[in-house]
Amino acid sequence: MYKRQERIRVVWSGAEYRGRGRETNWKGRVGFGGAQIQRMEKINAWNHERKLEQYNGDTVVFDAITTGNFGGFDAWLEKSDGATIDVSTNLGVMTVPLSDIGMEDVTMDAGGLERKIRVFRLPEENPHRTITTELEIPLNATGDNPLWVCVTTEDGFQAWSSPIYAFK
């Protein structure tokens, strides 16, 4: 029997614009109305002077900066039947029934350069450690085509390749 996953990931990302002064300050809270947070784990929260913590049994408060990168948290919930997720930030608000959140992103656009908050479910435990894929990538008719590969792990770390050059 299928059991709905109770692990919710909330991610904020993006920048104000390219270049200097691109920082985006995220200040807000995420409430899980009608549910209890059983456990919360931070993602890409390395600045200990910035707040990202659980408040009471149903809310996470945060004060973060992104400059094109991302941060966020995973929350493992209990008693979530009929619950909602209420995201309230200095850049916008979003309220969604938890029953409407699946493995695909539910997004709050916040302007800027790919600036947004994404909410989605993840498996309670992820047994997958490999991926194989094929992509069709349009190439320029002449000259070099530098391609980069970026791998993002579940815990938020990223690894970038050097450019891989394809040419016709």
For each of these PLM feature ranges, what is it?
Residues 3-168:
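C-terminal functional module detector
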